[in-house]
């Protein structure tokens, strides 16, 4: 894995864990554990696979972040 790819994956890993902050505690712990296992298992994956792996996790993180943004927006309105 190139150093540029490594930085991308590490940044994504941190982003996903940060996005779990909005989840209830029990789901956060479950999600964090799952993310750690997934990223650890795919440490040695080929470049082609890493691209798809990152795309899927970026989509997941974006989804959680949009839900958080929506939730914060709803709180500010009411």
Model regions and ranges:
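Intrinsically disordered, low-complexity, basic-enriched segments
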Residues: 1-78
């Amino acid at each position: 894995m190139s150093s540029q790819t490594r930085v991308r994956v590490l940044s994504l890993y941190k982003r996903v864990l940060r996005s779990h902050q909005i989840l209830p505690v029990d789901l956060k712990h479950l999600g964090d554990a799952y993310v750690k296992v997934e990223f650890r298992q795919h440490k040695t994956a080929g470049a082609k696979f890493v691209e798809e792996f990152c795309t899927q996790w970026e989509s997941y993180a974006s989804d959680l972040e949009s839900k958080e943004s929506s939730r914060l927006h709803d709180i500010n309105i009411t």
